Amino acid sequence: MNTVLIVEDNEKNMKLARDVLQAKGYRTLEAVTGEEGVKLATENKPDLVLMDIQLPGINGIEAFRQIRGNAATKAIPVVALTASVTPTDRSAITAAGFDAFLGKPINLKEFLETVKRLIEKK
């Protein structure tokens, strides 16, 4: 069973992602801060991380950099999730090197296709 770490501080968004992923047979781990996301990624080495960008504490981009900077977690695919889709935000996400970008509200078909594609690619 593949494991997906969801790093999201919005309870409704967390529940939606968790419910959709679990219904498709994925195991989920949950973090509500960037620091907690980095810790869970390091301890559990999930198959994929879904990373909100606007988080309390360190933001999603900094959490992503810490995950990529650790030899034990650098190969884990990370998807940026954000409601902020301005050109400046998109270019910051692209420049950081995320494996994919999904806007909110989540398009369920695109969400599941992205998760499946990145886990299979891994």
Task: Outline where the language-model segments fall.
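C-terminal output helix
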Residues: 106-116
